[in-house]
From Swiss-Prot:
GO terms for molecular function: 2 iron, 2 sulfur cluster binding; electron transfer activity; metal ion binding. Residues 53-143 form the 2Fe-2S ferredoxin-type domain. Its cofactor is [2Fe-2S] cluster. Binds 1 [2Fe-2S] cluster. This is Ferredoxin-1, chloroplastic. The lineage of its organism: Eukaryota, Viridiplantae, Streptophyta, Embryophyta, Tracheophyta. The gene is PETF. Signal peptide: none annotated. Its main location: plastid. Residues 1-50 form a transit peptide. GO terms for biological process: electron transport chain. Ferredoxins are iron-sulfur proteins that transfer electrons in a wide variety of metabolic reactions. Forms a complex with heterodimeric ferredoxin-thioredoxin reductase (FTR) and thioredoxin. PROSITE patterns: 2FE2S_FER_1 (PS00197), 2FE2S_FER_2 (PS51085). [2Fe-2S] cluster binds at residues 89, 94, 97, 127.
Length: 147
């Protein structure tokens, strides 16, 4: 490493070049075939894919079906499809959006209203439930849940 010294009337100043900082993050490979942050990369363009499941809602006016990603609440996905479902708090702390799970599996970890026994009986709050498989849910069940 080269240094330059300058003297002026008895004072000396030394200039040392600043070392180059290493790069903060190496580039990620485009497609390694391994999971990246829990998601798998695709074979074209390194796109990541997320699971989406078929949700069938049994409503008072008939059955409706739509696809719901595994990271979107069922109530939110239904609204995006133009399906009108009851709700109030949107936080899993009331029972306005209550339904009854008929088939499939859900993740309801974000809700705080239902107890474990109610979940085991199939009760679901659509505002705080993610699908983890294809599901069928009877909607508009608040009165039945709270009776």
């Amino acid at each position: 490493m080269a240094a330059t010294t300058t003297t002026m009337m008895g004072m000396a100043t030394t200039f040392v070049p600043k070392p180059q900082a290493p790069p903060m993050m190496a580039a990620l490979p485009s497609n390694t075939g391994r999971s990246l942050f829990g998601l798998k990369t695709g074979s074209r363009g390194g796109r990541m894919t997320m699971a989406a499941y078929k949700v069938t809602l049994v409503t008072p006016t008939g059955n409706v079906e739509f696809q719901c990603p595994d990271d979107v609440y069922i109530l939110d996905a239904a609204e995006e499809e133009g399906i009108d479902l009851p709700y109030s708090c949107r936080a899993g702390s009331c029972s306005s959006c209550a339904g009854k799970l008929k088939t499939g599996s859900l993740n309801q970890d974000d809700q705080s209203f239902l107890d474990d026994d109610q979940i085991d009986e199939g009760w679901v709050l659509t505002c705080a439930a993610y699908p983890v498989s294809d599901v069928t849910i009877e909607t508009h069940k608040e009165e039945e849940l709270t009776a």
